[in-house]
Amino acid sequence: MSMQPTDHIRLTAFVHGHVQGVGFRWWTRSQALELGLAGSATNLDDGRVCVVAEGPEDRCRELLTRLGEQPSRHRRVGTVSTVIEQWSEPRGVEGFTER
C-alpha cells in the first residue's frame, strides 16, 4: 500500500435506479479514469451499483456530481434516481475495475 497525499479521500457511492445491464459500470470507470481516480464499480444483488473512488477530494466530488446529475452532461447511461454517499480515509487502491 502506498502513502496517499493528505488531500486524498475515499468516496463510496451507492447508485440507485436503472443502472445494471446498461453499461453504467463501464461509463463510471471511464469518468473515474478521466478524473485520475482509482477504485471500482460493482453490481449489487439489489440492483444498485456501488462505486468506490479514491483520489483528491475535489475530483471525487466531481465524480459524485457526474454520477447523479440530471440531465447528464457527460452522456451517462442508465437512469439514476438516487446516490447515497459515504466518505472515509483512502486505502491506497490502484487502477479502476468493474466488478
From Swiss-Prot:
Q: Which residues cross the membrane?
A: none
Q: Which residues form the Acylphosphatase-like domain?
A: 10-99
Q: Which InterPro entries match?
A: Acylphosphatase, Acylphosphatase-like_dom, Acylphosphatase-like_dom_sf, Acylphosphatase_CS
Pfam families documented for this protein: Acylphosphatase (PF00708)
- Note the Gene3D superfamilies from the entry: 3.30.70.100
- In this protein, the active site sits at 25, 43
Its recorded reaction(s) are:
an acyl phosphate + H2O = a carboxylate + phosphate + H(+)
Q: What class of enzyme is it?
A: hydrolase
- Per its record, what are the GO molecular function terms? acylphosphatase activity
Q: Which SUPFAM superfamilies match?
A: Acylphosphatase/BLUF domain-like
Q: Which UniProt keywords apply?
A: Hydrolase
Q: Tell me which EC number(s) this protein carries.
A: 3.6.1.7
Q: Which family does it belong to?
A: Belongs to the acylphosphatase family.
> What's the protein name?
Acylphosphatase
Organism from which the protein derives: Corynebacterium efficiens (strain DSM 44549 / YS-314 / AJ 12310 / JCM 11189 / NBRC 100395)
Top-level taxonomy: Bacteria, Bacillati, Actinomycetota, Actinomycetes, Mycobacteriales
